[in-house]
């Protein structure tokens, strides 16, 4: 998003929209050059849908969602359900609960009133719609959202070449159950 940040600042744009290769995820840049993750996007959309009476129930997020997002929803009286990482889990939880908004910090956002999978362009349009509705810039729409410090760390594995499964357990299960 660094190039987008620079472009937003250079052109004094209101918003920068960064899509991934297939367009199902997005990250935003506000007018101050700050990067907004999927958690920020979920917060903006939840506040917008709630204010317009279109939020059905609560919001589904993955286990990777920042605890600050969950607490912000609780303060607003919006239920928050955590599910395993992956848009298939988000969609399954939306279908099970009847809710209509879910997503991940990666920018995979599902608003099931519009689509059943992540669509960065539709999500970006909804964000612009929210900015217009509130007549506020992105930075203002997320000012009350306080994230807890977190860091994703990849841990080294000394035995990278060895399989990370137990072959003897697999053999036992295969012998115990046919097919």
What residue ranges belong to the model's regions?
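Short, ordered loop/turn segments at secondary-structure junctions
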Residues: 21, 32-33, 41, 64, ...
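Short Gly/Thr/Asp-enriched flexible loops that form oxyanion-binding sites at enzyme active sites
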Residues: 24-43, 69-70
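Phosphate-binding and adjacent anionic-ligand microenvironments
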Residues: 15, 51, 55-179
